From Swiss-Prot:
Source organism of the structure: Arabidopsis thaliana
Kelch repeat spans: 131-177, 179-224, 226-271, 273-312
InterPro entries referenced in this protein's UniProt entry, alphabetically: F-box-like_dom_sf, F-box/kelch-repeat_ARATH, F-box_dom, Kelch-typ_b-propeller, Kelch_1
Ranges of biased composition (kind: Basic residues): 1-11
Identification of the protein by name: F-box/kelch-repeat protein At5g49000
Alphabetically ordered keywords of this record: Kelch repeat, Repeat
Length: 372
């Protein structure tokens, strides 16, 4: 039988877990592993260490994600909080410390988290790849030609070449990787009413147009054709450089009555009190989107729809009674869409949850998805 002194001596020779060598994995292997993880978890991973924060924003990681075909849509939301002139951006993340117990309480496990860098003014927004473009708008109550880019990989802003004309909240749409901007001018000049930004050459060029509407209520793109809804409704096909009217699809006019709309897989969806509808081109009529259990009683003065990687992101607000109606709660739902045998479209609510509490004075600027 060994003595206690001998036991202590023997134990002291055994290496402790803290002193055991743990060589770091090569960066390229770590990048390969992280590239296979959903980006929804990157904010949690960035809390691990300084090196992990660097890795989750590195260009190499996103190149690897693309190589492995692991790119995904990431939802971004822009809000105004008067009197602060600077809009604030939020993005959909997985909640940190989400556990099994919480999931059993009907929690989605998602949260709208603020990104640290703010954009300097409100503007029209579009997304191309991993970048969100903020175009024109108003700076100190004057139209602006400024174009800023939010790099969604690193959540940093940088400037792009300015437009040729100053525009106050123009219509902005993306066709074949180019940004077409129309309206928002103080002068009625059809030769300058629309211009296009080529991302590859980083240049702006005017697009000759037959009209010069100051106010544009809505604009969208279906099958490569831009639809512009103002006092007049016109269409433009960039590939053919051809202008036209809505014609047989006059019933598609969104006018002023639709609170929100989006195009998903070349199908137009819109919301107005009573529910969400989609436009059936063949019959030239609106049809109700079925299958939205739990959202049928949705009634809000502020509803936003967005294409979320082929699914629909639906955001709305509601008063918080205990706040004396001084605060709103912003909720989010993700809806998958499926074509039915009868040529209809049916939605399925994958999840919905309260995301964010905001003051009642806020303004909902927009929601869109970047690809990362």
């Amino acid at each position: 039988m060994s003595s206690p002194e001998r036991k202590r001596k023997k134990r002291s020779l055994e290496p402790s877990p803290e002193s055991t060598p743990n060589p770091s994995l090569p960066d390229d292997l770590i990048v390969s592993i992280l590239a296979r993880v959903s980006r929804l978890y990157y904010p949690i991973l960035s809390l691990v260490s300084k090196s992990s924060r660097t890795l989750v924003t590195s260009p190499e990681l996103y190149k690897t994600r693309s190589f492995f075909n692991r790119t995904e849509s990431c939802l971004y939301v822009c809000l105004d909080f008067p009197p602060d002139p600077n809009p604030r951006w939020f993005t959909l993340y997985r909640k940190p410390n989400q556990n099994i117990t919480e999931k059993t309480k009907n929690s989605s496990g998602f949260v709208l988290a603020p990104i640290p860098n703010h954009h300097s003014h409100s503007s029209s927004i579009v997304a191309i790849g991993s970048n969100i473009y903020a175009i024109g708008g108003s700076i100190e109550n004057a139209p602006s030609s400024k174009v800023s880019i939010l790099d969604c990989r690193s959540h940093t802003w940088h400037e792009a070449p300015s437009m040729r004309m100053k525009r106050n909240y123009p219509a902005a749409n993306v066709v074949d990787g180019k940004i077409y901007v129309a309206g928002g001018l103080e002068e009625f000049d059809s030769s300058k009413w629309m211009e296009v930004f080529d991302i590859k050459t980083q240049t702006w060029e005017f697009v000759l147009s037959p009209l010069a509407e100051r106010f544009i209520y809505r604009s969208l793109v279906i099958e490569g054709e831009i639809y512009i809804f103002g006092d007049k409704v016109v269409t433009y096909k960039p590939k053919e450089d051809r202008w036209g009217g809505v014609g047989e699809h006059q019933s598609m006019d969104l006018g002023l009555f639709f609170h929100s709309y989006c195009v998903i897989d070349n199908v137009l969806y819109c919301y107005r009190p009573g529910g969400i509808k989609w436009y059936e081109s063949e019959k030239r009529s609106w049809r109700k989107l079925r299958g939205l259990k739990g959202l049928s009683k949705l009634a809000s003065s502020c509803v936003k729809l967005a294409d979320y990687g082929g699914k629909m992101a639906l955001l709305w607000d509601k008063y918080i009674p205990c706040s004396g109606n001084k605060s709103h709660s912003i909720s989010c739902a993700v809806v998958s869409l499926e074509r039915c045998k009868n040529q209809g479209i049916r939605g399925k609510v994958e999840w919905f949850d309260d995301m964010l509490t905001v003051p009642s004075s806020y303004n909902f600027v927009g929601a869109l998805a970047a690809t990362l």
